[in-house]
Amino acid sequence: MGEPTWKDAGMGRFNVRPYIFIAPALIYLGVWIFYPILNALVLSFFDSPTGRSRDYFWVGIGNYAKLFQDDLFLKSLYHNIIWVLLSIALPVVLGLLLAVLLAGRGRTRLMYASIYFIPQTVAAVCAAIVWRWIYDPSIGPLNWLLEIIGLTGRPWLADESIVLIAVNMIGSWSYYGFCVLIFMAGLQNISPELYDAAKIDGAGALQQFFYVTIPLLRNAIVFVLVYTIIGSMKFFDLIFVATNGGPNEASTVVGLRIYWHSMREGRFNYAATMSTILTVVILALSVVVIRQIVTEDEED
């Protein structure tokens, strides 16, 4: 017998079966992700005095030039960045610490994890309505509890200096349970023998956390950070219901401004320009986080 040829190995036949299985996912991505992004990019190079497509005219990068001279847009983008930082500092860090504490609780950890995940199941609109009542300076229980312990209540959603933090607390309350579950899943893949070896070497609890847990949870941390960045940058519904960007636009984010320009004013091209810039910022931040983690992995 002669040596097998590339045709004998099946390389000459086109196997369509894998493409059939991934076709639904590709169609979904094409229709709901890539087409809207491409459409927004195209719209951003046009403008219309009436908002109708038949009145579109080419402006090139005119919308982008106007956008970066728009102080309100830049202020909204700044609020988005602050929101990202708060979302990393509060729910992500809290979720990681709770996951580590629950890791050694045996069967009860699933019960606690389920309890922590309950806020994640509450719709953002419902959460915003409930927390508006909690924050209410007249009838809300938060100020009432503060007064009981001798502290002064505050108009949480009417104070420009704290409103963004107050609204972010609502989002953090809803989101931290998701972080707990992801980190708990990652902790299941860490062998207990590594902790035993660290104890033998004299490592304390903090040393085990920083030199065993954190490095081995790197993939889970990257996923949560990227997911948090994407979710925080396009946040909209909770702020829309809780404050509608007020007071005095102190809690306005880019998503809310896109809604105002498109749905209220009919400036779809300008809103599309904002969407394009927001997409670029999200991709840039995500790439920075991923590259930083990958670089650290290569150095290790």
Question: How should these model regions be labeled?
Answer:
Residues 2-8:
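Membrane-interfacial, low-structure loops and terminal tails that flank and connect transmembrane helices
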Residues 4, 14-300:
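A structural signal for multi-pass alpha-helical bundles of membrane permease subunits
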